[in-house]
Amino acid sequence: MKNSSILFVLIIVVFLISSSGNKKMVGEAKKCDQTWTCEGEDKCREKCLTLHNGVGVCDLYTAPLVPKQCFCHYDC
């Protein structure tokens, strides 16, 4: 009896932990992104904030002959 109750509690705890990460709040904004050629870290941040009220970051590493890109992440 004791073993079955411990097993039952363990199963409930595992279920609660695994399902808690899948919940999405009602009305939560969808995440969108947009890219353009990076003209500098400051300009990237400023343009993203102005256009989309988001966060802009330039590439850290790029392939040769490929221009750096500004990645703008914002709520749709």
UniProtKB/Swiss-Prot annotation:
This is Putative defensin-like protein 184. Coiled coil: none annotated. Belongs to the DEFL family. GO terms for cellular component: extracellular region. Residues 1-21 form the signal peptide. Disulfide bonds join 32-76, 38-58, 44-70, 48-72. It holds the Pfam family AtDEF-like. It comes from the Eukaryota. The keyword Signal applies. It is found in: Secreted. One of its GO terms (biological process) is defense response to fungus. The keyword Signal applies. The gene is LCR18. Keywords: Antimicrobial, Disulfide bond, Fungicide, Plant defense, Secreted, Signal.
